[in-house]
Amino acid sequence: MRRRKGRISKTAPLRDEGAAGWENGYLEGRSDGYHYGLCESIYARAAPEAAPSRNIKVLYVKAEGSPYASLDQGIEEALRASVREVVVASPNDDVAQLAEAANPDLVLVLDAAGCSFKTEQVDRMRDGGLLTAVWLPDDPYHSDATADIARHYDYVFTIEANCVSMYRDIGCCRVFHLPFGVNPGFTRHVRVDETYRHDICFVGSAFWNRVAYFDEIADYLAAKRVKIIGYWWERLRHYEKLASRIEGVWMSPEETAKYYSGAKIVINLHRSADDKSHNSNSRNVPAHSVNPRLFEIASCAAFQLVDNRPELSQFYTPGVDIATFESPSDLVGKLDYYLTHDEERREIARRGLYRTVNEHTYRNRIQRLLSVIFG
């Protein structure tokens, strides 16, 4: 039986769609592979020459809370690469007794809000002739508490530049601004499956300024492939619009790096310094400095849109190795733009990765800390 001319097979459109889907997937996979290869090259060539190890012993007291896991890991690794010997302790240990036995050249404490290391132990160590330093990760949000803590130490390092004068005003003599950084060997770009691939990703708790932002752009986000990870997002007025995209959990640093690596855009929105429902900042110290997440996102070669803080330009150049936003409407406009400009987006992310590996690692920060104390 002869086939009629002009008859169209019912399977042809499906085959065409399948071929187009295969081609798009192939091109996207090839682009991802190319990006991954360039990132691996950057990790290898951007790292500066390691500084000589100092012939000193450091006792490091960890913060040991889930939000501080990547900080503890990065600081400990950097110390081990920078000094002769490192002894690590928990804030719940009898650190003063441990220090008496270990006799370190320096006791360094990462003091976390809500689970602070006992200042009585700091006083015991100082009375025994030991040199002490504290690195404060929650400034300026809990400055009421940290003001009482800081005066017990020989050296105070704060991630918020505006807190330096506050600590000096209350009698701390040796106070320095020292931002956090990242460990690129631990927090880095990885190849991921579809589970971690999204147009837009945000990782962090729903502080009220973030709630206001996300409520304003909820309709836009609901039309995109979005992932939001963190506590308290049920506070959203438009929670139902985004509920299926929200995972209300704490995410490990390893899992977080996978979500950063798989996202086209990561939003980084700092918390507010005047949120009285979460903060203890009665001096109203403004927040001008950047959060650790800034460096962690960049170290994953992820493109980030970050709210523009005064200190940001000391670390990255907007439009070159990072992108910024000023308002919810500006954020939506830039999300739209960069979601449709793949190569420009990835090029900015790779420049950010290079600068991070070259300038903003924990090894870099620890070298500065040790230089301040020991010269």
PLM segments and residue spans:
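Extended catalytic core of nucleotide-activated donor transferases of GT-like folds
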Residues: H35-C173, N183-R188
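Catalytic binding pocket for nucleotide-activated donors in carbohydrate/polymer assembly enzymes
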Residues: P52-E64, S70-S90, A257-G375
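Residues that mark the start of a beta-strand
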Residues: N55-Y60, R174, R197-D199, R225, ...
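Conserved catalytic-core segment of nucleotide-activated headgroup transferases in glycan assembly
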Residues: V192-I265, R271, D275
